[in-house]
Amino acid sequence: PAKARACIFIFLEGGPSQIDLFDPKPKLNALDGQPLPESLTKNVRFAFIKKESAVLLGSKRTFTRHGQCGMEFSDLVPHLAGCADDLLMIRSMHTDQFNHHPAQLVLHSGRPFFGLPTAGAWLTYGLGSESQSLPGYVVLSAGRGTSGGASLWQSGFLPSVHAGVLFRSQGEPVLNLTNPPGLPPELQRRGLDA
């Protein structure tokens, strides 16, 4: 059997909803515009939704099946749909967290609090890295960052070598690669050798 050597995890904070990209909801589309059912609102406090006036909103996108696997994609991602047979899609995840940051922590670490290794940290811990001189886990950012910040790529209680390295799209691509002005290289070497 094949053994995984790498993983590309795409997390699009602020991106389109999954129901407009990868997760068709025919029943939701059939109920579009109708009030929220009591089964969803009873004994639930919402931070930003007025239960009395809230209505269900289905997707306006068109979904079609792609590849031999028949994975469904919306018309918003035609190029990604062309890779359907090379992708793994997980549609069974859910959370009781309704605020973004705790929900993001659940997605990345399995729990809604700080200090735990993220999925990327566990992957580098388990799979290792093909290079000792390059990071095994990198994070790409569009520039504005995430509401979860570095807590979404931390190593938690695993050694820090398993934390994600942020690659920035603006300014210095990777922070702290050069010595501060005035720090002699031999002083840094002594610190590393200590």
Predicted regions and their residues:
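Ligand-binding pockets and gating/stacking loops
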Residues: P1-A194
